[in-house]
UniProtKB/Swiss-Prot annotation:
Entry's localization field: Membrane
Organism placement in taxonomy: Eukaryota, Amoebozoa, Evosea, Eumycetozoa, Dictyostelia
Glycosylation sites: 162
GO molecular function, one term: G protein-coupled receptor activity
Gene assigned in the entry: crlD
Protein name as catalogued: Cyclic AMP receptor-like protein D
Primary localization class, coarse: membrane
Transmembrane segments: 17-37, 124-144, 177-197, 254-274, 296-316, 343-363, 373-393
Extracellular topological intervals: 1-16, 145-176, 275-295, 364-372
Record flagged with keyword Membrane: yes
Key words, A-Z: Disulfide bond, G-protein coupled receptor, Glycoprotein, Membrane, Receptor, Transducer, Transmembrane, Transmembrane helix
Length: 470
């Protein structure tokens, strides 16, 4: 979508093939990301269903055996504390009416609906992958038509032939709009991921703090009314929280859809209106976008999204550093750390893909002769088309695994050169777990959070029930 015409026909062909190569890889990466998320979500749903059935069986067994009087329910189907573990004496009355099975079933159903209706990070990544997929498909189609079907590429539609020159509609001008729409949508969805994760970090800290205070107050109440008060308050709170969160999540979801799809579509339409045909008498006619319109409708939203995503990522990192000192849950710390690592990778991807394009645009924008560098144009066009495949690699944490692999390889090489064979063997056993890049470190591997190398980020739904200590 360059606004200059200083490059030759051969130069534009080279740039076009670079974009086609990068877009082809991005199609593979975008489809792979969507498939992996869908598979992981199915596995998570089956796992949660099994856990709910097991919890329901335990509740029914406790009710039938009469031993449920020693169980204090703290959260819906997720955490239970024994009165013996809390050093609280059981109620002095001989027996009481336990919680009916129907209430347990109702709570399980509410939790299931609540989890399904939560706005999840994996859902945001799917939309980001769809936007990358559309951008790649449009990029390949437009570039191939420009190179091999140029007569149809610049052919003006009959309905617009009698209009002004800048308003001529062709495949070329429409292509500028749809490519711009898709790429702008990727900017907005990347920003949406960082904003949503930051909001979840804040809300999870607040909810956990309130839940802990309420649990302590409820446990310190009169032992005779302790269980009834907790059950009644939690049932009422679960219903109210479900209704409120359901409404708020629907509003948030619709807002994100509007911002990340509708607004980019409007901006893409502006790019179409700002496109014009140039070099009609050359061997490879093409169309360009007015530099001012391109700045306002494309690069200005890009700059805003880059700055905002960086800002929210820094806030999340700062928030995590503060919460880490006060949090005693190692599993929660590991989960939050993985979320931040992948968010940083997504930020790095969008910076790597679009900073060269920004540099190229502003060089031509402020130069008098619309100066362009062929090598910079090829790099920027190729890398920006690779956003989908780079997001896919970030989703798999390939970069971190490669770094760990080469670090361990260096340690292994140093250990082999050491004269102390015992220390060498110990270091090798500590540094390697399976000896390949598709495995985690051998030290302190959390089976619950590191079961599968390929499916990590899709588990970071960060629902309130998931972030509590189990």
């Amino acid at each position: 979508m360059s606004s200059c015409s200083s490059l030759s026909m051969d130069d534009r062909v080279k740039i076009g093939y670079g974009s086609i190569a990068g877009a082809s890889l991005s199609i593979i990466g975008s489809i792979g990301t969507i498939i992996l998320i869908k598979i992981r979500n199915k596995k998570q749903e089956k796992k949660l269903l099994i856990q709910r059935k097991q919890q329901l069986s335990i509740n029914n067994l406790n009710i039938n055996s009469g031993s449920s009087s020693n169980i204090i329910t703290i959260s819906n189907s997720t955490t239970s504390l024994s009165s013996n573990n809390l050093n609280i004496q059981p109620p002095s009355f001989p027996s009481y009416s336990p919680l009916p099975t129907s209430i347990s079933l109702s709570n399980n159903n509410n939790n299931n609906k609540n989890n399904n209706q939560k706005t999840k990070v994996s859902h945001f990544i799917i939309n980001l992958s769809i936007a990358n997929l559309l951008a790649s498909i449009f990029m390949i189609t437009i570039k191939l038509m420009m190179i091999h079907f140029n007569d149809k590429f610049i052919k003006v539609l009959p309905s617009t032939a009698n209009h002004s020159f800048n308003a001529l509609i062709s495949v070329c001008t429409i292509g500028n709009g749809v490519i711009g729409f898709s790429f702008i949508s990727t900017f907005f969805w990347t920003l949406a991921i960082s904003m949503y994760i930051y909001q979840q970090f804040l809300s999870s800290s607040t909810i956990n703090s309130n839940n802990n205070n309420n649990n302590i107050n409820n446990i310190n109440n009169n032992n005779n009314n302790n269980i009834n008060n907790i059950n009644n308050s939690k049932n009422n709170n679960s219903i109210n929280n479900f209704n409120n969160s359901n409404k708020s999540n629907k509003i948030i979801k619709m807002l994100f859809y509007f911002v990340c799809w509708v607004i980019p579509f409007v901006l893409g339409s502006i790019l179409v209106s700002g496109s014009r045909l140039i070099e009609l008498n050359s061997d490879l006619p093409w169309c360009s976008i007015d530099s001012n319109i391109q700045l306002i409708s494309f690069y200005f939203p890009l700059i805003i999204c880059l700055l905002a995503t960086t800002f929210f990522t820094i806030l999340i990192k700062y928030k995590f550093s503060n919460d880490k000192l006060a949090c005693s849950s190692s599993s929660l710390i590991n989960l939050q750390s993985k979320i931040i690592q992948r968010l940083i990778l997504f930020l790095i991807v969008i910076l790597v893909c679009w900073v060269p394009s920004l540099i190229s645009f502003f060089i031509s924008f402020f130069s008098k002769n619309c100066k362009q560098f062929l090598w910079l144009e090829i790099i920027s066009s190729t890398i920006q088309s690779c956003q989908g495949i780079l997001n896919f690699l970030s989703y798999l944490s390939i970069f971190k695994k490669l770094k760990l692999y080469f670090k361990n390889l260096k340690k292994k090489f140093n250990n082999n050169n050491s004269n102390n064979s015992n220390n060498s063997n110990n270091n090798n056993s500590n540094n390697f777990n399976g000896g390949g890049i598709f495995y985690s470190k051998g030290k302190k591997v959390n089976n619950q959070n590191s079961n599968n190398f390929y499916f990590t980020f899709s588990t970071f739904d960060f629902d309130n029930n998931q972030i509590q200590e189990k």
